[in-house]
Amino acid sequence: MTAARTRAATPEDVAEICLGLPEVELGTSWGDNPTYKVRGKGFVMHRPPGRTALDPATGEPFTDLLVIQVPDESDKQALVDDPTLPFFTIDHFHGYAAVLVQQSRLGEVSRDELAEILTDAWLTKAPPALRKAFLADG
C-alpha cells in the first residue's frame, strides 16, 4: 500500500474517492446542496448550516458537514459509537441510515478508511447490476 492511501484523509479526498466510483456525478439535492450521486441517487451530501446541527462547544451551526449514507442502523451505530472516529448523528437523522462528519475532522481517519466508508455509501444507492459488476471487479 502506498503512503498516499494510508495517510490521513482530507476534504479533497472526498471528491477524488466519490468521483472515482462508477457512474458518479456531482449534482445537487435538497435545493442547491452539492451531492455525489450514482444514477441520480445521492450518497454523500454537503449539508448547509442549520439549527438542527449545532456545535456543542459553541452553540453555533456546523459549517462544514457531510452527510454520508451507511448500509444500515448497525453500521451507523458502529461509526457513531467508536470514540476514535469523528462521525456523529443528530436527532434530525434518527431512524435514517446516515452519519455526519465535519470536513475539518476528516484527518482523524485514514484515506483508506474514508474510501471504505464512501464506497459503502455508494453501494447503498447504486443499482443492483452496477453493484454486482463493481463487486465482481473488486
Report residues per predicted region.
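Charge-dense, helix-prone N-terminal extensions
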Residues: 1-138
